[in-house]
Amino acid sequence: MSEPLLIARTPDTELFLLPGMANRHGLITGATGTGKTVTLQKLAESLSEIGVPVFMADVKGDLTGVAQAGTVSEKLLARLKNIGVNDWQPHANPVVVWDIFGEKGHPVRATVSDLGPLLLARLLNLNDVQSGVLNIIFRIADDQGLLLLDFKDLRAITQYIGDNAKSFQNQYGNISSASVGAIQRGLLSLEQQGAAHFFGEPMLDIKDWMRTDANGKGVINILSAEKLYQMPKLYAASLLWMLSELYEQLPEAGDLEKPKLVFFFDEAHLLFNDAPQVLLDKIEQVIRLIRSKGVGVWFVSQNPSDIPDNVLGQLGNRVQHALRAFTPKDQKAVKAAAQTMRANPAFDTEKAIQELGTGEALISFLDAKGSPSVVERAMVIAPCSRMGPVTEDERNGLINHSPVYGKYEDEVDRESAYEMLQKGFQASTEQQNNPPAKGKEVAVDDGILGGLKDILFGTTGPRGGKKDGVVQTMAKSAARQVTNQIVRGMLGSLLGGRRR
């Protein structure tokens, strides 16, 4: 059985996180500069010590220091001595760095189909009507065996469906040119921001996070998010997609002695800001269900009020750093934060929140029965790793000596919707340049668009026989090579994604 993790201390009290309760989720809150990052780092390296892999997003660029041993100083030793810590020893931790843009870590990619229309609609800032059209686009792609892997696939099928909207209207409903235009503008905007890097293959294999090193320590996976953070919706969507991948791919585990992985979601308010209710409902569902897969999710934000109540109620472990109350709204937030913790008769929780110093926190971890412990005021013990970023040379060393180096660096562009539609256009052009011989019957729905539709999606003969088009032929060929192209994953019903 894993030993409890010592996270914080007072001169006469030790506060432990029970490994078996780490997957009951958690919350780290506090104003800027009060010590949230240090707490996050301490929790991450403590979990790593007992063989639990960790994922966390590095928004400020200062978490990578967890890969290097800390530096001993007189000030640090004096602070540790004041709270009764006498056995502190600096050490490094196993770290793999990731980056959606592929600049400061291994590239992270998802296919368009896997992200799904629900998250993509939020990325594109679509309204309900436009989101409905995006769902139709995904449905047509699914029905016709068109793989949506990268941005050019989505652009190509959006343009094709927009140009042929009337052909699909009877089966799928109205596809307005205005909605198609909004989707195309959204795609252009995302592409100009560099978001296209996120879409494609090889897609992230979530099992690459579930590693331990030769000494049995859990690997700490750090997503470089300084640039990504400037695109809040992509930041939130990409991390939520990662959570959904964990849920979809991991088997049911029940209650374990320690989690399979702990996922820290920094700047968590970005996940919920302006999110439609349907997405909020799905987020709540994912958080509730993922616990049974042995995954703990910890949100990091400034205030507990950043988290919707139905999600907040699922976060059993709490670390509350200082909050400032300069306005009536701030005072209300402090009071609400105090009410989320189990009161300690020894002090006024609401008052204490405003008095906490840097690195000091009000802490309530779950006990062995899963009940919140009485809140205690304590100092978070300094991490044994470096508090600050790695150098460029150190980062390059982490990348080049990573166990996944070479797996994600080169993008793969296999045959998908874009290539299928391009072949259809080429075949249609050839048909236009070589019209039927004189006297032969010409299809009623002639012209380049009608001809293209027949070439792409096939024709029906006078006796009802179906002749496959380019799409069907290529899809059948691809299906023989790839057994799981368009199969919906379990989370497809949750987030609208489709397995490749």
From Swiss-Prot:
The gene is yjgR. Gene3D superfamilies: P-loop containing nucleotide triphosphate hydrolases. To E.coli YjiB. This is Uncharacterized protein YjgR. Pfam families: HerA_C (PF05872). InterPro entries: HerA_C, P-loop_NTPase, T4SS_component. It comes from Escherichia coli (strain K12). The lineage of its organism: Bacteria, Pseudomonadati, Pseudomonadota, Gammaproteobacteria, Enterobacterales.
